């Protein structure tokens, strides 16, 4: 059996002994049939938990996986860290007792639980450290799952327990997906906590009762939408975004790009789907709006194109739920009858940024070989487009983060964490940032001055662009109005 090699940098630190941590480099050999624990045993003098709980390249790993599988996921360059550097006890082991002390006040408020139930929190506590959030007040995902467990055991205390995790600055509404930060991108934790958020936003607890009411009021349907089964058009561009995000810059550049690609676009009155929190607050309303939008495109014989990441991820989720639940389709189609629409499986949707990345048969007139871009996207894509236009856009883990949804529930935390991302990109030396999310674009552009003050850093004028704008500039387009650049807060001066 062949011997394979791996380069590993290991976090070394012992509390009460070391002032600063350090990373020690190892070149390890392994065989195809070996597991992570076999590898850790080669690290002489390094402390670790035999019930695997650590981070590889900032991704949490909780299983003794085969090394070959881990190499396929992480490549052959690893950085091993404890789940939390803040609570590092020795090397890869954290001080869980110190973490548990944070919940002493909570336990004083629930005197009815048993000693065994109190100790149950220990089984959840490691989950707190998957989430990369930097909000120091955040109570933690593991703690939220523990409270959910208690709610099932004490249904009469459900509302009181829910209220304890409802605070805007520290509570469960601050949760964002952790799937990208967990080995194998497991989304079970996401679904468990989304369910808890749904329970909270449908309760009578303030401010979430009003938050839900206000969001649901934004679902607006056209009572008599147009229907042209055989139109002289080929596609429709989804255009129903929250008004404060000012999507015109993105929509204008996306439309121009599609026209240059030979597409003919029909404008349709799509319905807002509630954005990030739509599917959490009311699954049925979210699915109805999504089905309406898909059925409207179908009724007009066109493909439905999404030029924005968050809306595209929403429609993917909606289609998956709808297409796997015929009874939900039947229920929603009853509602759609009033609009003379019918939802059916197989309606074509397209993500414009994937199109930009794959359809490259056009002449490059303005290469970007002198520029560096910092891209922020939750959807992994190849570098085909960047290679075509000769743009350097280095990968970094934080590029998968998006804290813009927090602006709706905890503005200060959302601003701080979005601004942290913005300056990570700027400090990499980026000439411009690339946002695939309208919410993140809004934070980077419109809120940058306010956010920089809170972040305690002088505001930087580095602009943020959308992918269609970059593609158009690479094709030679220089009209700032046509590109939608005139609506940006930070002016793009490189044309």
Feature-to-residue mapping (PLM):
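Iron-sulfur cluster-binding electron-transfer modules in prokaryotic oxidoreductases
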Residues: 2-24, 36, 202-495
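Signature of N-terminal electron-transfer/Fe-S-associated modules in redox systems
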Residues: 2-216
């Amino acid at each position: 059996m062949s011997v394979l090699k791996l380069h590993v940098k290991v976090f070394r630190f012992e509390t009460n002994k070391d002032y600063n941590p350090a990373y020690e480099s190892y070149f390890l050999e392994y065989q195809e049939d070996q597991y992570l624990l076999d590898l850790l045993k080669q690290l002489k003098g390094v402390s670790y938990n035999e019930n695997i709980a650590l981070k590889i390249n900032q991704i949490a790993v909780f299983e003794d996986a085969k090394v070959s599988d881990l190499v396929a996921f992480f490549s052959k360059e690893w950085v091993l860290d404890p789940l939390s550097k803040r609570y590092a006890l020795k090397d890869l082991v954290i001080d869980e007792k110190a973490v548990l002390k944070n919940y002493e006040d909570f336990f004083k408020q629930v005197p009815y639980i048993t000693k065994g139930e109190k100790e149950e929190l220990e089984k959840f506590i490691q989950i707190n450290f998957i989430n990369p959030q930097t909000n120091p007040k955040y109570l933690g995902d593991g703690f939220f799952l523990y409270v959910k467990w208690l709610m099932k055991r004490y249904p009469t205390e459900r509302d009181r327990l829910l209220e304890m995790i409802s605070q805007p600055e520290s509570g469960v509404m601050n949760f964002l997906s952790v799937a990208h930060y967990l080995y194998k991108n497991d989304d079970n934790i996401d679904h468990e906590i989304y369910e808890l958020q749904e329970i909270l936003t449908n309760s009578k607890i303030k401010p979430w009762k009003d938050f839900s009411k206000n969001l649901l009021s934004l679902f607006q349907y056209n009572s008599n939408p147009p229907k042209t089964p055989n139109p002289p058009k080929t596609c429709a561009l989804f255009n129903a975004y929250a008004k404060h995000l000012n999507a015109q810059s993105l929509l204008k550049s996306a439309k121009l790009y599609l026209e240059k690609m030979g597409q003919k676009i029909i404008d349709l009155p799509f319905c807002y789907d509630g954005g990030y929190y739509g599917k959490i607050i009311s699954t049925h309303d979210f699915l109805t709006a999504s089905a309406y939008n898909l059925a409207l495109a179908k009724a007009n014989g066109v493909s439905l194109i999404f030029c924005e990441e968050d809306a595209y991820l929403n429609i993917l989720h909606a289609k998956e739920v709808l297409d796997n639940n015929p009874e939900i389709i039947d229920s929603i189609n009853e509602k759609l009858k009033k609009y003379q629409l019918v939802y059916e499986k197989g309606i074509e949707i397209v993500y414009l940024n994937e199109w930009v990345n794959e359809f490259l048969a056009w002449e490059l007139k303005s290469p970007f070989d002198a520029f560096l871009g910092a891209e922020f996207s939750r959807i992994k894509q190849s570098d085909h487009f960047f290679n075509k236009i000769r743009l350097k856009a280095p990968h970094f883990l934080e590029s998968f983060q998006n804290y813009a949804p927090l602006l709706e529930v905890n503005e200060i935390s959302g601003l701080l964490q979005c601004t942290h991302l913005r300056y990570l990109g700027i400090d990499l030396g980026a000439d411009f940032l690339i946002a695939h999310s309208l919410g993140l674009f809004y934070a980077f552009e419109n809120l940058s001055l306010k956010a920089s003050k809170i972040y305690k850093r002088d505001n930087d004028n580095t602009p943020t662009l959308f992918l269609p704008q970059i593609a158009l500039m690479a094709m030679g387009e220089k009209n700032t109005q046509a590109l939608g650049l005139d609506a940006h807060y930070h002016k793009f001066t490189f044309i």
